[in-house]
């Protein structure tokens, strides 16, 4: 697979990167090398290899969910810069 400088510019724009002309040329060569390596990996026969999501066996390490005593609203909100009854008041994130 071949990659050109226009595609590098497109990827840079998506990543919100500003690249100099020499960087575009450098990254074009590097991306071509990476894609060539991936192509060689695609040639491997993986029919007898089971799909994996982790290299080592893993299990969830959840703790039991049980009710435990906690601090009350008054104590939790004692140092809050702004509150509304029993809730923290925070600045809006989305307008």
From Swiss-Prot:
Top-level EC class: ligase
SUPFAM superfamilies for this protein: Glu-tRNAGln amidotransferase C subunit
Pfam family, one: GatC
Lineage: Bacteria, Pseudomonadati, Thermodesulfobacteriota, Desulfuromonadia, Geobacterales
Taxonomy, superkingdom: Bacteria
GO annotation (BP), single: glutaminyl-tRNAGln biosynthesis via transamidation
UniProt-listed Enzyme Commission number(s): 6.3.5.-
Subunit: Heterotrimer of A, B and C subunits.
InterPro entries tied to this protein: Asp/Glu-ADT_sf_sub_c, GatC
Gene from which the chain derives: gatC
Record-stated family: Belongs to the GatC family.
Record field: catalytic activity: L-glutamyl-tRNA(Gln) + L-glutamine + ATP + H2O = L-glutaminyl-tRNA(Gln) + L-glutamate + ADP + phosphate + H(+); L-aspartyl-tRNA(Asn) + L-glutamine + ATP + H2O = L-asparaginyl-tRNA(Asn) + L-glutamate + ADP + phosphate + 2 H(+)
Name of the protein: Aspartyl/glutamyl-tRNA(Asn/Gln) amidotransferase subunit C
């Amino acid at each position: 697979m071949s990659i050109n400088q226009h595609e590098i510019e497109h990827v840079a724009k998506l990543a919100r990167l500003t690249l100099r002309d020499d960087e575009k040329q450098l990254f074009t060569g590097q991306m071509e090398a990476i894609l060539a390596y991936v192509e060689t990996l695609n040639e491997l026969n993986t029919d007898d290899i089971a799909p994996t999501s982790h290299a080592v066996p893993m299990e969830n390490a959840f703790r039991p969910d049980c009710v435990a005593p906690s601090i009350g609203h008054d104590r939790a909100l004692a140092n809050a810069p702004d509150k509304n009854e029993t809730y923290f008041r925070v600045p809006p994130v989305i307008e």
